[in-house]
Regions:
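Short alpha-helix carrying the canonical HExxH Zn2+-binding catalytic motif
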Residues: 115-126
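Nucleic-acid-interacting cores, centered on viral/eukaryotic replication and modification enzymes
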Residues: 129
Length: 224
């Protein structure tokens, strides 16, 4: 995963509203790195094992921008997009329902944590879409194929997830695209929270057109 100090990003800070809402947003963004990593620790991941696959309806990794075995590409793509914007919208809703920093959820944790967890799930999904073991992209970065977890070995999958960085520790082309897409998603979240819906919609459209666009959805394998 690519971690970004979202709370220190100049654009994000400039977009934040004053006083209490600004403080809460900065706290949410500061919690993101751990929230993104923790997204991978779920019961659904149990289905990635041969034993667990018999009892759960889908592969756990399919919740992270991947396909179930035999799933049409169009359906896998739609599910992946929903895993990006569904949690992002949930994060907006949770933030808007929050009275103050100390407002507790039923899990006795701050609702700030709930917002970060939802937003972290969205970031996790968009970042997974830039792993070649999750998604095959063309030279421009357009999505060509959503990969199926059941077709892969664990070691190969893990190696692909680390391909955002080269041997010298620098971002690869995919890594740079991933970082740009992550920042754009965070911009979308902030703009939605501060009720700048027109600007947020422009961010969403750019994210879809530039970073989450299928290369040719009319070709074979992408039929409904």
């Amino acid at each position: 995963m690519i971690t970004i100090d979202a709370a220190s990003d100049p654009w994000l800070r400039a977009a934040l509203p004053p006083r209490d809402a600004r403080r809460r947003l900065l706290k949410v963004l500061s919690k993101l790195p751990s929230a993104v990593v923790d997204t991978d620790i779920t019961l659904e991941q149990f289905s990635d094992t041969g034993f667990g696959h018999k009892f759960l309806g889908q592969d756990g990794q399919a919740t992270h921008f991947m396909a179930n075995k035999g799933q049409p590409q169009r359906g896998a793509y739609a599910a992946g997009i929903d895993k990006v914007f569904g949690p992002a919208e949930r994060a907006v809703q949770l933030f808007n329902e929050m009275a103050d920093d100390s407002d507790l959820s039923t899990r006795t944790t701050s609702r700030l944590d709930d917002v970060s967890i939802a937003l972290g799930a969205a970031v996790n999904a968009v970042q997974d879409s830039f792993s070649p073991t999750h998604v095959q992209r063309d030279q421009r970065g357009d999505i060509m194929r959503i990969q199926a977890w059941r077709d892969q070995l664990g070691k190969d999958h893990n190696a692909g997830d680390r391909s955002w960085q080269d041997g010298g520790g620098n971002l690869t082309k995919l890594g740079r695209l991933c970082m740009e897409a992550t920042i754009l998603l965070l911009q979308y979240f902030v703009l939605r929270v501060v009720n700048k819906d027109a600007d947020a919609e422009r961010c969403r459209r750019k994210l879809m057109k530039v970073y989450l666009h299928p290369a040719d959805p009319s070709r074979s394998g992408w039929s409904p």
